Structure formats: structure tokens, C-alpha cells
Amino acid sequence: MTRDHRLVGLLLGSLLLPFPALAQGGYRLPPQAVADAIDAPPPPSIAFAPDAARALEVHRDSLPGLAEVMRPMERLAGVRIDAPLRARHRTQYNRELWLRDQLGRERTRIPLPEGEQLAGASWSHDSAHFAFTTVGEGGTSLWLGHVNAPGEPRLVTDSLCAILWSGYTWTSAGDGLWYSVAAPLPEAGAANPIPAGPITSECGGELSPLRTYQDLLECAEDAALFEALVRSELFRLDPGSEPLSYGVALWGAPDPAPDGEHVLLRSIERPFSYMMPWSRFPQRIEVRDSNAQLVQAVAEVPLGEGVPIDGVRTGARNHGWRPAHPATLVWCEALDGGDPKRDAQVRDRWLAQAVPFAGEPIELLRTAERARGLTWTADGQRVVAGEYDRDRRWTRALLHDLAQPDAEPRVLEDRSIRDRYGDPGALMTERDAQGQSVLIQDGAFVYRAGEGASDDGARPFLDRQDLESLRTQRMWRCSPGSYESVVALERRTPGRFPRFLSRYESPAEPPNYRLRDLDAQAGGIVALTNFLDPTPELRGVRKQLVTYERADGVPLSATLYLPADWQPGTRLPLFLWAYPREYNDPSTAGQVSGSPYRFTRFSGSSHLFFVTQGWAVMDNATMPVIGDPQTMNDTFVEQIVMAAEAAIDTACDMGVADRGRVAVGGHSYGAFMTANLLAHSDLFQAGIARSGAYNRTLTPFGFQAERRTLWEATDTYIGVSPFLHADGIDEPLLLVHGQMDNNSGTFPMQSERLFQAIKGNGGTSRLVMLPGESHGYRARESVMHVQAESIDWLQRYVGARSVD
């Protein structure tokens, strides 16, 4: 269908019409126990207000139907658009919204318009106001509510435009909204199926390597449709006032200044690109005042062509406001041309300039490596600057005192990004009274919440750190045998430890929220929710953390699941599920991730359901690829084979697995791993590969962590491409892929071509292409079918095998 035809269709049929019923005869159901668990309603999601006194409670169904997933979409400039809604295409909405007090004793159902569904909800930083969006026949509506009258939300607009951003954000005061109203679509001319001309691209000799993107613009009609759908009018709504228009443009999210009188605005401009997503299109960045008048044209950001892979644009980027200052703009600039391959003593600098932008900007600080953002103290005088060393995969965080520019910054964090054990935890932040993100502070103390990775699994913690001495005090740590993580700190009371919200779970108890008081006896625990186990019939499944070593001594780990009725001495068929990750050194590669004490949620297309069919499952088996970041993939195949062999040996040595009945599977890069293991080893009797990429010559400018191009590392690209070794895949391989996969690199064609290669070489394979599905699978019909196909495949080629 031509774009002109589609625009006519939008104008004539902009109602939310139901998608035509699809023939379901081809979709299958898995065993009843699996189907029942998939259909079990999930617990509601909880969003606490910033002061933690109240919460929004959102209810949804387990899975959407295929008709909802397959609603028509426009695939333009790297974004999928539900045109009648003037919003991003999504596969599931929510059905109920409630306001509850902290303890859940008082709950008020917030009314939704008849026939409409809840898209999302959020709190203002003042904790008194909340907003939510609904979708219906006329489009997307924005509503504003107050905690004192939750049953009487106010309709702000029934024509929200939420394509490039959420479509609304809070004013500095927190009691009003910035929002974007969809501009009327232009009148469509008569549909013309004859192209106006050829599609041309040209290059002029400059280096411009690009990752592979999907859903890009393809022609002038695409560009016109994208522009028409994204164009909107930006408004500011304050209490007691009429909405004030800031004009029509291709608006991004506005960023109001602390003074409430100025706002930073971003808009997309032409020329568009046919090779990059909209985030690389030219941008206009400007500051306007409370009367919508232009104060300063901050930047005209050019089309992002020629930006090196893993690099950044030259010129100003990452604009934002400095907290505790009325209207001081802060931004970053590259000093190395934005190229991570260029040698440089200093890569970035941060600058600031106050409205009305008189004089020259002030340089705040420089970073030796690529800047990763700023985290401010509440007074705006000290700032934590993050930076990242791409070559070493190393992260640092330095505390700068801007009142003492000559003082050396103090190091708060300095570690490999893969060093889970050395992670000091994330600095906890909150929104101040003007809506700016700042560190949570008690005098000189700031707070950190972390995962607490250890050899025994994760034990989350809460620390506080003195910014004067940099000493850290452990305030709380999760008890052994469970998993409890910090959600948020309550507003602090001077002279006492803070209370904090946590999310508690254990192998037998589903996640629930708690309030912990560190000043009270025995931790002062108060239960805030009481969500029940959605699948109690599966709770008998056994689960344990298993540690072992690769042949070269690298420590590895996995979580082993066994059926509830398993008896010691009984050997089961084994299913190994993994995802390779890259490491610079063995010490971090061997660190344990995750926790064996988390609640196991059986849902969706999860491979954990195989345990209900009599399988042992080794989940999240570590598959480290270790070496120099530039060359580690030269030994990718050897390393994953070694890790897989170690996992199988361990399960067999434990007496739970039968070496003659072992299968392997993975998703995305894990699917790539699966195909390689079948092509280059005889460890497995079958495999399941979902949504993978198998021919790396089709991702020639890098993939995953590979930094070299196909022409720089031809042998490696060929060596790790299972498509080019399809003649070696002599074990049965089930290939599953969403027909609408938009993940970079994993085009659906990748699975289609691998299937053809296996078939042509006399191998055994089955290709399942899922209509309407993207990189993950959402529709109930699709999920059920994937489970049925997977269970049957394993039983047919592995589970039913005779044991030698």
C-alpha cells in the first residue's frame, strides 16, 4: 500500500476499530498446567508517591490477545506509531487504576472513561497531584488528578501526541502540566500508486559506519507521514489559568527551569535521514520564557551522520538545568571529536551559562573519559560526574566541589563495569521542590542502594556515605535466604535514621512491599501489600545456586531448577539456557549474578516451564567471553563451548542430568550462541534459538561488543557466523522469530536464511515465524504456541531418547 493510501485511511478511519479476527486454527496450546500458569493474572504494579504516603495501583490482564498486538502501525524513523492514537504502538494496556494510602487500608478506584483503557500513570514531585493517560476511539487522553479528590480527575486534552516522548511532564511547581496536543493531519491528495521518482542515496568519501537499524524512512512519502503524525502543539497549564501555547513543531520533551519562568525546548527538524532513526535527526534547542517568547536559541544540532560507533556528536549535547539556581543551563561538549578511538587526555567538558546568556559560558569541569552524566547535591554546589572508559570497560564517579574549582575531585567509584562485587550501589536521588533530580542528603551524608552481589548470590543493601570523609556505613542488608531490595527512602526526619520502602520476596513468597524503620526494634517492619502467589501449584519446584569451573579455571555459576517430584539418583533430561557476556579479565567473569532466593515467576514464553515437563533446567548459566576488548571474539566459539561443557559436566556429576539428553537454548545473542554451540560441538542433542542473528556479515560495522568492522576482522566475522557453518548444525534446531522484530541486527530474515541453509545441507530444523510479534513475544496466542512448539521439540528429539 502506498503512503498516500495510508494517509487517506488515517483521515477517513481514525476511529479505534477492532482488528479483524484472525484464523486461529494454526495456533497450538501447551500442556494444561503450563497454559493455566500463563493465564494466571499478575499482581498489580505499585507506584509510590515521592513522599511514600500514597501509591497508585495499576491492574492489567496476563497477556493481550493477538488482535491487540496486531493493531495496525506505521513504522517510521525507527519508531512504531499507532496512528489513530497519535502514540507509540504498544501491545498491552491496563484495565484499572486505584489510589491507596501507604498501608492499603483506604483504596479509591479512579474512574476511567467507558470503553477506554489505561495507558499509564505518574506522580508529580509534590506528591499531591497525579496524571494518567487513556486510549479510546478518539485518540489518547490526558487526565490530571488530586489526592484529595481522586474520583474527579480533570480532562486536560483528548488529543495527546505521545510519539517522541510521553506527551506530558510536570511544571516546576508540580501542580501543572506541559503537554503536547496532536496537530490536525493535512488533507490527503488523491492516492497515487506510481512513485514520484527513484530513491537515491549518495556518499562522498567520508567515514560513516552505522549500526543496522530497522523501521527507517524509505521515501519522501514516509518522511511526510512521519512529520504529519509527530507534529504537535505544546501547551503549559497552570492552576487557575488557561493553557498557554508554545507553538506547533515536532516537539520533544520540555525541561522546565527551577525558577518556573523558563523552559528548555527541543524540536526535530528537516532534513530527515533514510539511514538513521529520528534521534539522529537535526534538532533545534532553545530557551523560552513564561510568555512563550524566545530567550535564546541554544543550539542547532545537525544531522547525526558521521558520528563514530560508540561515539558522540561534536558540539553541545546533554543540556539540562543546574539545581538550586533559578535558570542556569548546563551542557557537555566533546574535546576528542566525539571519537572513542582517538587518543585523548581529556574527552569531555561540562559548561554552564545563566539566563539571559550574557558573556561567555563557564567551564565547570572536565572528564578524562566519556562523560556519563551529572548528579547534583541539593544546593547545586557539588556534583558527582560519571565517566566511562570504553577501552577498559571501566566506570568512575568523581565528586567535584564547584565552589573550589582548584581542588582535586574526590573519587567515589572506580571499577570495571563487570565488577558486581565491587559495586558500591547507586546514589539515591529525589526530586526537589522545583522538580530537579538531586542527591538525597542528611547533612553530609548521602545514601546508596545496591544489589550486593556475592559468591552466595545477591543480598541488597542500603549504605550511607559521608561526603566529607568518604567513609561508608552499612545501614541495612538483606537477610540470608530471601531477596529484599530498597525501593525508596521516605522523607527524612532530622535526628533519626530514615524509614525506607522495600520489596521482599523469597522462593516461597511472591514480591510484596514493606516499610522498614531502622530506628525501631527488630527493624520495625510493616507490611504494605499482600499479593498472593499466582501459581501456587508450581511452588514445589526446587531451585539452587550451582557454582563450578571452566576447564581453564574460570569460575562459573547457574541456577538449577528441578521438578517438585524429583528423587535423588534420578537423572533427567537437561536444558541449558544462557546469554554470553564479555569480560576483560577472569576475576569479574566468575562473579555470581542474581539470587537463588528470589520468587520464581512462571510466565510468558519462559523456558522455566520445561521443569514442569520433567526437565532439569540450568538457567542463566554464565557464558563469559574473556579477553582484550578489541580481539576477544577471536576465541568466542572456543570459550562458549568450554563453558557449556563445564555446565553439563557439573549437572551430570551432581547426579541430576543424563549426558545423552541435553538441549540448549537462548534468546537474541543467546540464540546466536545456541546455533554456534550446535555448529561447533557435539555436546547437545537439540537446540531452541529465539529471535537471533546468525550471519554477521549482515551486521558489518560491529555487533554486541565487537568493535571491529567486517573488513578489519573478516576471519572472526566468518568464524562466529553459524549461517556460514550451517553444514555443521547436525542436531535438530527449533528457530523462533517475530515477523515484526525491530531489534537492531536481528532482522527476521536472519532466522529464515539460517533455516534455508540448514535445510539445504540436509539438517533438521523447524522455523516458527510469529505474526505481529517483535523481538519478544506478547500475544497470548503466540506465547502459548511457542511453549507448545518448544516442549514438543524437546520431547521429540531429546526427552524420548533412549539412555545408553
What positions do the PLM features span?
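Secondary-structure transition/capping motifs at alpha-helix termini
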Residues: 150, 288-293, 356-357, 389-392, ...
